[in-house]
Amino acid sequence: ANVKLMVGFTLRFVPHYVQAREIIQSGKLGKIVSVYSRRMNVITQADRLGGRIGVLHFLGIHDFDLLHWLLGVEPDQVYSAESTSVEKRHPQENETFNTFKFKDGTLVCAHIGWNLTTAHPGGRDFKLTVIGDKGSLDIDLASQGLLMYSEFGSKFPSTAPGLDVEDKAFIDCVLDDKPVPATGEDGITALKMVLAAIDSIDKDAPVKII
């Protein structure tokens, strides 16, 4: 069918992450050594979904795609583990650390969970740290936003919220017959990462992403 398919990977359109990708790909951070991402929601988010889906399918898939998109390199393997110190309110995974090795050797740790209490002032905690051999970059969506430290100096780029950017991008692709920025293949890669992470939790062992 002659239709446009665009996967709703919203993080690709958040200005902070768009700037982060531009900085990474410009080489200002040098060769990327490691990346840490954190995406946390309050526990009531899990209650709202009532066990119909786990945190990796709900939140993790967005961060996994973000990491793949930022680095522009294919993931190779993952070792994932979930916390079992507190009895879960739902059967699916709800607090995980996922360590990926990408095919260029970059090490990535993604902390994905929804165990923040309702006392948390923001109800969510989203962070990203990128370490390169010539500089580093930090994103904290609860505070300053995006910070960069490198031989080019320290910068605090101006950012603004923009979820509408995603909708506009898709409309433009349809009207102007342009390639979509998040393809079905991108969706398949992110889903493979999620399924491998869940498999790793079940096996308590590293799993290749095929």
Report residues per predicted region.
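Predominantly a Rossmann-like dinucleotide-binding segment in NAD(P)-dependent oxidoreductases
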Residues: 3-6, 11-90, 204
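A short, polar/proline- and glycine-enriched secondary-structure boundary/capping micro-motif
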Residues: 119-124, 148-153, 157
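Short, mixed charged/polar active-site loops
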Residues: 107, 136, 153-155, 206
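Active-site loop of classical SDR/Rossmann-like NAD(P)-dependent oxidoreductases
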Residues: 156-168
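C-terminal helix-rich "cap/oligomerization" subdomain common to oxidoreductases
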Residues: 103, 172-210
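Contiguous beta-strand/loop segments that form the cofactor/metal-binding neighborhood of enzyme cores
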Residues: 64-144, 168-180
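Short, hydrophobic secondary-structure boundary micro-motifs
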Residues: 32, 78-79, 140, 181-183, ...
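A generic structural signal for residues located within well-ordered alpha-helices
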Residues: 15, 59-62, 165-166, 185, ...
